[in-house]
Design a protein with these regions (language model features):
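Conserved beta-strand scaffold positions in the cores of enzyme catalytic domains, especially
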Residues: 3-6, 56, 124, 141-143
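A glycine-rich, often tryptophan-bearing local segment used as a flexible ligand/cofactor-contacting loop or short
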Residues: 31, 35-100
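Short, basic, glycine/proline-bearing loop/turn elements
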Residues: 23-33, 156-163
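Extracellular ligand-binding/catalytic regions of CAZymes and related secreted enzymes
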Residues: 47, 148-190
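Structural motif
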Residues: 21-28, 57, 141-145
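A short, well-structured beta->alpha microelement
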Residues: 1-16
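Catalytic beta-strand/loop cores that center a nucleophilic Ser/Cys/Thr
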Residues: 91-154
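Alpha-helix C-terminal capping/helix-to-coil transition sites in glycosyltransferase folds
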Residues: 18-19, 52
Length: 190
C-alpha cells in the first residue's frame, strides 16, 4: 500500500521523503511566481528524492513543473502549451473538455490549459485529438496534461454537464499510477 503524505513548503524537512514512493503535483493555479514562492525552496529535496529512485506524477501545472524551468526532471523533453500547437482543437485557456484517446479508448477529459510534450524519448499513454501526447511516462516521471482527478463540481457549467465522467477518470488515474509508476495493482487514490 502506498504511503500518502500531504505537504506544504513549511512541512518539508530532512527525511520527509524517506518513506515516500511517489510525489504528486496535481493541477491547479500556478505559474512561475507560484513555483518560486512555494516550491523552489524544496527543489533540492524533490530532486534528491528523484535521484534516490522516487517517482513523480504531475497533472496539468504539476506536469509543467517537471520541465527544465522548474524541477528539471525530463531528459530531452519539453512541456509546451497544448493550445499553442498549430493543430490543437482547443485554442484558449478556459475550463473545457478535450477529446483524448487513453490506452486506445476515446474520452472527453477536463482540460484547463494543460501541456503536451515534445522531443526526447517517452512512452505515450494518451493523446489529444490531434495526436499530440497528453499523458506520458519517462522513466520514473508520469505526466498528464488533462485532469483525470477532476471532481463533479468542475462540470457545473451547463455546457460541461454532459461530460462528467462519473469517476471513471479517477479509476484511469489510479491505474496509470499503479501500472506505470508504482508497478502495483494495489493503488486506490479515490
Amino acid at each position: 500500500m502506498a504511503n500518502i503524505k500531504l505537504f506544504t513548503r513549511h512541512k518539508v524537512c530532512d527525511g520527509f521523503f524517506d518513506d515516500v514512493d511517489l510525489v504528486v503535483f496535481p493541477g491547479g493555479d500556478g505559474e512561475a511566481t507560484t513555483f518560486k514562492g512555494i516550491l523552489k525552496p524544496n527543489l533540492p529535496d524533490v530532486q534528491c528524492f528523484m535521484q534516490r529512485g522516487g517517482k513523480y506524477l504531475g497533472i496539468c501545472m504539476g506536469a509543467y513543473w517537471a520541465d527544465a524551468y522548474y524541477f528539471n526532471l525530463l531528459k530531452g523533453t519539453r512541456c509546451v502549451q497544448y493550445i499553442k500547437r498549430p493543430s490543437a482543437e482547443i485554442r484558449s485557456s478556459y475550463g473545457t473538455t478535450a477529446q483524448v484517446t487513453w490506452r486506445g479508448q476515446e474520452h472527453r477529459m477536463y482540460f484547463y490549459d494543460g501541456p503536451t510534450y515534445l522531443g526526447g524519448q517517452f512512452d505515450t499513454v494518451a493523446t489529444y485529438a490531434n495526436g499530440d501526447p497528453m499523458a506520458i511516462i519517462q522513466g520514473s516521471v508520469g505526466l498528464i496534461g488533462c485532469h483525470p482527478e477532476s471532481q463533479a463540481n468542475w462540470y457545473s457549467k451547463k455546457y460541461m454537464l454532459p461530460h462528467w465522467h462519473e469517476n471513471r477518470h479517477h479509476l484511469m488515474l489510479s491505474q496509470f499510477v499503479a501500472d506505470y509508476l508504482l508497478h502495483s495493482r494495489q493503488m486506490h487514490l479515490f
